[in-house]
């Protein structure tokens, strides 16, 4: 996160999308977006949450991941002890999951396309979501046409949540 702010200030990045992160800097503008849901996703070979007991959890060390993981463990009634910490991107995690190397708790927007294509399975979708991501940019750049159009697009984009009308846990 700190490196994204650094890249913004250096001008190598115009806009950053982040999970909730408190930034106290007058040069930086932070725009909250709509809430976004989290899901438990696994490869296509996993069809039921009970199968996860022997599958490694690919875990990003974020507050939101921890929050939803705690909820999931309480709900399923067992601890997910096989854990692998991932410092890479969500794309890295998705590729590991597709190759059968684990499962993860991820924001739905990040796996939407794979779920629609059938390359990832949603094992559980969480009922309530109060979490938001942030659009972060340098204040003096907010009126630039390309940046303002992109920010407007992000503010108005609605995730297709049809999958959330399905059963919540498999």
Report each predicted region and the residues it spans.
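Short beta-strand->loop
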Residues: 29-39, 117-131, 141
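A late-sequence structural motif
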Residues: 123-164
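Central regulatory/effector-binding core of bacterial HTH transcription factors
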Residues: 1-24, 86
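Flexible hinge/capping segments at coil-to-helix
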Residues: 28-68
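Secondary-structure junction motif
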Residues: 55-79, 160-167
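A ligand-binding cleft/hinge motif common to bilobed small-molecule-binding domains
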Residues: 20-26, 90-123, 129
